[in-house]
Amino acid sequence: MTPGTQSPFFLLLLLTVLTVVTGSGHASSTPGGEKETSATQRSSVPSSTEKNAVSMTSSVLSSHSPGSGSSTTQGQDVTLAPATEPASGSAATWGQDVTSVPVTRPALGSTTPPAHDVTSAPDNKPAPGSTAPPAHGVTSAPDTRPAPGSTAPPAHGVTSAPDTRPAPGSTAPPAHGVTSAPDTRPAPGSTAPPAHGVTSAPDTRPAPGSTAPPAHGVTSAPDTRPAPGSTAPPAHGVTSAPDTRPAPGSTAPPAHGVTSAPDTRPAPGSTAPPAHGVTSAPDTRPAPGSTAPPAHGVTSAPDTRPAPGSTAPPAHGVTSAPDTRPAPGSTAPPAHGVTSAPDTRPAPGSTAPPAHGVTSAPDTRPAPGSTAPPAHGVTSAPDTRPAPGSTAPPAHGVTSAPDTRPAPGSTAPPAHGVTSAPDTRPAPGSTAPPAHGVTSAPDTRPAPGSTAPPAHGVTSAPDTRPAPGSTAPPAHGVTSAPDTRPAPGSTAPPAHGVTSAPDTRPAPGSTAPPAHGVTSAPDTRPAPGSTAPPAHGVTSAPDTRPAPGSTAPPAHGVTSAPDTRPAPGSTAPPAHGVTSAPDTRPAPGSTAPPAHGVTSAPDTRPAPGSTAPPAHGVTSAPDTRPAPGSTAPPAHGVTSAPDTRPAPGSTAPPAHGVTSAPDTRPAPGSTAPPAHGVTSAPDTRPAPGSTAPPAHGVTSAPDTRPAPGSTAPPAHGVTSAPDTRPAPGSTAPPAHGVTSAPDTRPAPGSTAPPAHGVTSAPDTRPAPGSTAPPAHGVTSAPDTRPAPGSTAPPAHGVTSAPDTRPAPGSTAPPAHGVTSAPDTRPAPGSTAPPAHGVTSAPDTRPAPGSTAPPAHGVTSAPDTRPAPGSTAPPAHGVTSAPDTRPAPGSTAPPAHGVTSAPDTRPAPGSTAPPAHGVTSAPDTRPAPGSTAPPAHGVTSAPDNRPALGSTAPPVHNVTSASGSASGSASTLVHNGTSARATTTPASKSTPFSIPSHHSDTPTTLASHSTKTDASSTHHSSVPPLTSSNHSTSPQLSTGVSFFFLSFHISNLQFNSSLEDPSTDYYQELQRDISEMFLQIYKQGGFLGLSNIKFRPGSVVVQLTLAFREGTINVHDVETQFNQYKTEAASRYNLTISDVSVSDVPFPFSAQSGAGVPGWGIALLVLVCVLVALAIVYLIALAVCQCRRKNYGQLDIFPARDTYHPMSEYPTYHTHGRYVPPSSTDRSPYEKVSAGNGGSSLSYTNPAVAATSANL
């Protein structure tokens, strides 16, 4: 190959490489899709396993959109702050950047802004009238309020300080972020605040009378206590100060947030509050006569009792403080949030509250006669009872307090949120509420006659009872406090949030409420005659019943409290949020509400005649029924409480949030609401005639029905409570948030709402005539219907509650958030709303005539319809609830957020809104004539249309629910089983989806989009690809008919809001229109709508409807729409006129799918380039050939030799002659030898040549 032909090959190779690179870029930039135009969305057709099919997908629509009216952008990291609003009258600004701060409101009248940047600080309100701003940037500080009248700002940037309030009247700011300061007490008479953020300073008290501030940010300073009478503030930022007690008579507040402070008691007569947030402070009792509050948030402080006569509150949030009792006569509250404080009782006569949030404090009882509340949030405090006669409340939030009963006659409420408190009953005659959320506090009863509330959220506090006659509340948030019962006659509430408190019953006659949120408290019954509510949120409290005649509410949020019934005649509500409390029934005649949020409390029934509500949020409480005649509400949020029924005649509400409470029914005639949020409470029905609401949030409570005639609401958020119905005639609401409660219906005639958020509660219906709302958030509660005539709302958020219907005539709302509750319908005539957020509740319909709203957020509740005539809204957020329709005539809204609820329609005539947020609920339509809004946010609910004539708005933000959905201008009728349609946001567009063909039950998907394009009035959408549980993706046949429909809404005015999809006006109208069309075109051929546009002229609505080809024509589209105009006017308040329908071509440019794909275009370009290169090469080759002919032949290698070496010539020639170069005629003698060069200039000897030739 010549050099002239090489260069084109190099050029061709270079161009080929560049072409391949360029083609790859094009191919990768167009992955099966095309770019959007400014006004129209085009859809690509991805590869499919089937040919001749159009699969319309959208890569720009999102099924997740901000709620209506929300200006939050998608994907924005928003941190939840449950309650950051300033109190009434406050001029404070709202908390900025607050993270999970349940209560950061400044006190009433305070001008301080709420906590700014606070993290997980449940309560940091400054005291009432305080001008101090709340804690700023505080982390996990449940209560940082300065004392009443104090001007000091709350702890700023404090970490994990449950209560940072300075002592009452103190101007000193609470201890700020102190860690491990064993004793940081200022000297006696000192006005200096305790160690502030001190680190490892064994003794940081300033000298007596010193005005110097303690070491600030000092590390390992053995003694930083200010001297007695010193006004200097304690060391700031000191860690590990063994003794943080202020001296006797000192007004300085104790160390705040100190860790590992064995003794943080202020000296006798000291007014300084005990160490706040101290960790591992064995003894944090203020000295006798001291007014300082006990250590707050101290960890491992064996004894945090203030001295006798001290007014200081007990250690708050102390950890492992065996004894946090204030001294006798002390007014200091018990340790709050203390961990492992065996004894946190204030001294006898002390007014200090018991340890609050103490962990492992065996005894947190305030001393006899003490007014201090029991330990609050104490962990493992075996005895947190306030002393006899103490007014301190029992430990609040104590864990593992076997006995959190206030002493007999105590007014302290039972342990609240105690875990594993076998007995949290307030003493007999006690008015203290049962342990609330206490964990494993064997005995947190306040002493007899004590007014202190039981241990609240205490952990493992064996005995946190205030002394007899004590007014201190029981340990709050204490952990493992075996006995947190207030003493007999105590007014302190039982341990709140205590864990593992076997007995949290207030003493007989106690008015303290039962343990609230106690875990594993076998007995949290308030004593007989006690008015204390049952344990609230207690875990594993076998018996949390208030004593007979007790007015304390049952254990609230108690876990595993076998018996949390208030004593007979008790007015205490049943255990609230108790876990595994076999019996949390208030005693007979008790007014205490049943256990609230109790877990595994087999029996949380208040005693007969008790007014206490059933266990609320109790887990595994087999029987949480308040006693007969009790007014206590059923267990709220109780888990596994087999029977949480208040006793017959009880007014206590059923168990609220109870888990696994087989029977949480309040007794007959009880007014207590059914178990609320109870888990696995088979029977949480209040007794017949009970007014207690059904179990709220109860888990696995087979029967949480309030007794007949009960006014208690059904179980709310109960889990697995087979029957949480309040008794017939009960006014208690059905179980709310109950899990697996087969029957949570309030009894017939009950006014209690159905179970709310109940899980697996087969029957949570309030009894007939009950006004209790249906189970709210109940899980697996087959029947949570309130009884007929009940006014209770249907189960709200119930899970797997087959029947959560309130009884007929019930006004209770349907189960709200119930899971797997087959029937959560309130009874006929019930006004209760349908189950809200119920999961797998087949029937959560309130009874006929019920006004209860349908199940809200129910999961798998086949029927959550309120009964006919019910005003309850349909199930809201129900999951898998086949029928959540409120009964006919019900005003309850349809199920909200229901999952897989085949039928959540409120009954005909119901005013309840359709299921809201329901998942897989085939039918969530409110009944005809219902005013309830359709299901909101329902997923896979084939039919959640409000019935014809219903005034309820369609389903809002429903996913895969064929009925109606709000929050979206586009819906999908999806025929697949458990198929999910995915969408992504596009410019002002709405999703458009294609159904699968694997089921006969249609489902719908509604999603709202807020992303906009350049056009303010143009809407476009791309059909989302739907998927199902089948191996092949669902496909749509190529035959699709599109119709352009426009109409005028004459009663609305067009404004700029309809040009901005983020406005409430725009979203509401768009949602209403979407839902309306879902109701109009219900046949299987309807595929969805898109391109909703609003124009001036009143309001002109233009949109595009899609149907399967051949299923409908223009005339039918217009006819069906005109027939529904009157319904739209009544339901959506839309006066429609000038309807125009026309057949239009496919608006989404689906034909583009038949074109050349991107890779094909890239390949075509590559081929074109290669062809061009070949043409260039051929042209170059032709040019070279032409040039060669024009310029002659260049002989690079000539054939002739021009040089011959002389060696070829002979040296001697005899007959040689000269041969001329041009001579051709040679003689043989003159020829040149071929071997001699062949040159014409050579001489040849003929003889030699001949001889050579012949050789």
UniProtKB/Swiss-Prot annotation:
Topological region Extracellular: 24-1158
Region of interest called Interaction with P53, as start-end residue ranges on this chain: 1192-1228
Lineage top rank: taxon: Eukaryota
Subunit: The alpha subunit forms a tight, non-covalent heterodimeric complex with the proteolytically-released beta-subunit. Interaction, via the tandem repeat region, with domain 1 of ICAM1 is implicated in cell migration and metastases. Isoform 1 binds directly the SH2 domain of GRB2, and forms a MUC1/GRB2/SOS1 complex involved in RAS signaling. The cytoplasmic tail (MUC1CT) interacts with several proteins such as SRC, CTNNB1 and ERBs. Interaction with the SH2 domain of CSK decreases interaction with GSK3B. Interacts with CTNNB1/beta-catenin and JUP/gamma-catenin and promotes cell adhesion.
Signal peptide residues on this chain, from the entry's feature table: 1-23
Residues carrying lipid (S-palmitoyl cysteine): 1184, 1186
Region (Disordered): 23-1033, 1214-1237
Keyword Ribosomal protein: no
Effect of residue 1203 to E: No effect on nuclear colocalization of MUC1CT and CTNNB1. No effect on in vitro PDFGR-induced cell invasiveness
Residue span of region Required for interaction with GSK3B: 1223-1230
Gene Ontology terms describing biological process: DNA damage response, signal transduction by p53 class mediator; mitotic G1 DNA damage checkpoint signaling; negative regulation of cell adhesion mediated by integrin; negative regulation of intrinsic apoptotic signaling pathway in response to DNA damage by p53 class mediator; negative regulation of transcription by competitive promoter binding; positive regulation of transcription by RNA polymerase II
Organism the protein comes from: Homo sapiens
Biased composition (Polar residues): 38-54, 90-102, 971-993, 1001-1033
Recorded consequence of changing residue 1229 to F: Greatly reduced EGFR- and Src-mediated phosphorylation. No nuclear localization of MUC1CT. Reduced in vitro PDGFR-mediated phosphorylation. Decreased Src-binding
Record-linked Pfam families: SEA (PF01390)
Substitution effect: residue 1191 to F: No effect on EGFR-mediated phosphorylation
Tissue specificity remark: Expressed on the apical surface of epithelial cells, especially of airway passages, breast and uterus. Also expressed in activated and unactivated T-cells. Overexpressed in epithelial tumors, such as breast or ovarian cancer and also in non-epithelial tumor cells. Isoform Y is expressed in tumor cells only.
Annotated disulfide bonds: none
Keyword rRNA-binding part of the UniProt annotation: no
Annotated positions of the Phosphotyrosine modification: 1203, 1212, 1218, 1229, 1243
Protein name: Mucin-1
Additional record remark: The name KL-6 was originally that of a murine monoclonal antibody reacting with pulmonary adenocarcinoma cell lines and pulmonary epithelial cells. This antibody recognizes a sialylated carbohydrate chain on MUC1.
Transmembrane regions listed in the UniProt entry: 1159-1181
Motif (Required for interaction with AP1S2): 1243-1246
Disease tied to this protein: MUC1/CA 15-3 is used as a serological clinical marker of breast cancer to monitor response to breast cancer treatment and disease recurrence. Decreased levels over time may be indicative of a positive response to treatment. Conversely, increased levels may indicate disease progression. At an early stage disease, only 21% of patients exhibit high MUC1/CA 15-3 levels, that is why CA 15-3 is not a useful screening test. Most antibodies target the highly immunodominant core peptide domain of 20 amino acid (APDTRPAPGSTAPPAHGVTS) tandem repeats. Some antibodies recognize glycosylated epitopes. Tubulointerstitial kidney disease, autosomal dominant 2: A form of autosomal dominant tubulointerstitial kidney disease, a genetically heterogeneous disorder characterized by slowly progressive loss of kidney function, bland urinary sediment, hyperuricemia, absent or mildly increased albuminuria, lack of severe hypertension during the early stages, and normal or small kidneys on ultrasound.
Start and end residues of each stretch annotated as Required for interaction with beta- and gamma-catenins: 1233-1241
